[in-house]
Amino acid sequence: MGFTADDCARCRADFPALRTMHGGRSLAFLDGPGGSQVPLAVIRAIENVYATCNVNTGGQYPPSREIGRRLHEARRAVAALLGAAGPESISFGQNMTTLCFSLAHAIGRTLSAGDAVVITELDHEANRSPWLMLRERGVTVREVRLRASGELDLDDLASMIDARTKVVAIGASSNALGTVNDLELARRLSTEVGALLVVDAVHYAPHFAIDVQRLRCDFLLCSAYKFYGPHVGILYSRPGALERLPTDRLSAQNPAPPYRFETGTLNHAAIDGVRAAIDYIAALGRGADLRARIVDAMHGIGAYEHALAADYCRRVAALPGVRVYGPGFDRTMRAPTVSITLDGRHAGEVAAALGEQAICVWDGDFYAVRAVEVLGLAARGGLLRTGFSLYNNREEVDRLLSALADIAR
């Protein structure tokens, strides 16, 4: 049956933040790419940890065993979300950026001067800066060109992957333009030369079903706060991949995956919130097991968001002085993220005007600094970005378009 406007209406009641008012108007959170709101189930899960088992793991008493069980269940839930073989492939961290720096540092210790890493001009800096730092070790970093269409130059990608390439680091979807990259091509090219494939799925995970086993990536990173959870970073490691890396850890720390990449005491309450967020998504789908329900739900949610974003994109493009950036919505694989500029207007000025009308959108480069530079938009304040989540509806789209029409006059 998919995910419908009626489903959206029911879900909206689950998100307390949607009842927040500003100037007599309810806030329209159209800033999903920057982070989603959380349902009450996630809030209660976090609260329950602090109320009942706010202790460390590994103890010989009930609350310690309980929090250990919850962390295992959270890994199991993330494994189901990503299509991983099991919870031992799932590591948690402070955020995706910190995990990617740790991953790049560990991989970098295995590389030699003259080895090459491939990144892209389209990616968020969290999947660029950690790899660019490897230049200090004599590693060559090659950057795949971004075309004016908002898509990567795939011929350029193919030309950069050769026998010296040890890592291909690529985003699944652009947080600035909504572009969905050709991961199957990246995987095929990297496999041909024996390079590691590292995927940034932060902007992809909230909108599409992920199957890491089908993709056959070596590492995949995402962030729970983009899919209705708390601020927790997630690292998937292909079985056998993490064990080969030299990691910074305490001598007393468990060296086995998934603990090999986890330092100190984790944010137990937030991690249980991740589990609750995934359970919330799964409850919106149908299937015989958790994985099947997640996939079904993501297909429905993604189609709903795509239709909402496509309608907004078509209508906003018709406003005077508006230019839309990124691929069109005539394709199915397009994230529900729409970025625009208005002639003669700084993106921050427009975002502030919308904010006063209780409409939450984002402006700037969104840490996709290089992409905004390549598009020649840095001096204009970057882009005005709108992103849709499962709780957004057509009434909010109409509010946004009406406000933009007034600003564009």
How should each PLM-predicted stretch be described?
Residues M1-R409:
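Pyridoxal 5′-phosphate
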